[in-house]
Amino acid sequence: MINIRKTHPLVKIINNSFIDLPTPSNISTWWNFGSLLGVCLILQILTGLFLAMHYTSDTATAFSSVAHICRDVNYGWFIRYMHANGASMFFICLFMHVGRGLYYGSYLFPETWNIGIILLLTVMATAFMGYVLPWGQMSFWGATVITNLLSAIPYIGTNLVEWVWGGFSVDKATLTRFFAFHFILPFIISALAMVHLLFLHETGSNNPSGIPSDPDKIPFYPYHTIKDILGVLFLVLALMTLALFSPDLLGDPDNYTPANPLSAPPHIKPEWYFLFAYAILRSIPNKLGGVLALIFSILILTIIPLLHTSKQRSMMFRPLSQCLFWLLVADLLTLTWIGGQPVEHPFIIIGQLASILYFTILLVLMPITSIIENSLSKW
């Protein structure tokens, strides 16, 4: 009997990607986040689709259409909170996934790593535009502040901002185009995720030890499938707990006030997952300098493979680098906290020191530490 799984042109691709895929036998739970991101993406597309059926992208009715979804649509409140908190879970998984890549040296697969960075930027853009759609106070002012950063670009800045806005301020045209982009981008993300997987399966997965695992591979199904399902159960449990018990925990109360262009909220801030970058932006007194620091805080990931000076791929057996990695994690948590605080003493100086430390760890301390560890390993 012919095995369709291995011969059918379409099923064969799925088989080689998710069933018979040779996988290192020693990959840990840190490798679960790729599949969790896939689950998050599917969940966001499905909940978003149902929200889009009832949402209207018009400044006059956007806020009330979201209220209508929560009050009048069957389980609309549940769909809305699953979508809003699903974004938070998405970013938690993203940060864990990138952190794992940094820790275990997965960035030495340059194609996979660079597609991953493009994915990260695309997801960030999608989330930002989604935050604007409910048309609350923080939606409006967040959109105004962040899009206004484009005006820091010399010569063409002002024209560029007005082009993005579709007028002389954030208004109906801006909301309509943001909704259009927010709808289409998840499908682009899906396509990019497939390319990400394509490049990953060219090389095979990395593993915690960082050494080639060709002699010791096992099929993806059933071993890692069952492991992924456990991860999905934990993800859904966390998401359900968040959406059902404290749906507004990670949101901003200001967004329950309809957008008012005539009065700005006392503290304009983005969603929690952008606060680290927002803190870096605010820590530099110069507008253009702040924007460049903001962009570089993410794009710094592109040069990480060039800064790898260690003879070992993974940090598993490099205690000094491990200390620096966890210092970087603590620094990012500090930046996240600072991003949500008002611009006053002592938060300004803490933010500046944390921003300097962030770039110093990645650009200076990690490469130097790796060189020191290389010399220590000769003893």
Curated annotation (Swiss-Prot):
Binds 2 heme b groups non-covalently. Heme b b562 binds at residues 83, 182. PANTHER family: CYTOCHROME B. The cytochrome bc1 complex contains 11 subunits: 3 respiratory subunits (MT-CYB, CYC1 and UQCRFS1), 2 core proteins (UQCRC1 and UQCRC2) and 6 low-molecular weight proteins (UQCRH/QCR6, UQCRB/QCR7, UQCRQ/QCR8, UQCR10/QCR9, UQCR11/QCR10 and a cleavage product of UQCRFS1). This cytochrome bc1 complex then forms a dimer. It is a multi-pass membrane protein. The keyword tRNA processing does not apply. Signal peptide: none annotated. Heme 1 (or BL or b562) is low-potential and absorbs at about 562 nm, and heme 2 (or BH or b566) is high-potential and absorbs at about 566 nm. The chain crosses the membrane at residues 33-53, 77-98, 113-133, 178-198, 226-246, 288-308, 320-340, 347-367. Its cofactor is heme b. One of its GO terms (molecular function) is metal ion binding. Gene3D superfamilies: Cytochrome Bc1 Complex, Chain C. The keyword Protein transport does not apply. Keywords: Electron transport, Heme, Iron, Membrane, Metal-binding, Mitochondrion, Mitochondrion inner membrane, Respiratory chain, Transmembrane, Transmembrane helix, Transport, Ubiquinone. It comes from Ailuropoda melanoleuca (Giant panda). Heme b b566 binds at residues 97, 196. A ubiquinone binds at residue 201. Belongs to the cytochrome b family. GO terms for biological process: mitochondrial electron transport, ubiquinol to cytochrome c. It is found in: Mitochondrion inner membrane. This is Cytochrome b. Pfam families: Cytochrom_B_C, Cytochrome_B. One of its GO terms (cellular component) is mitochondrial inner membrane.
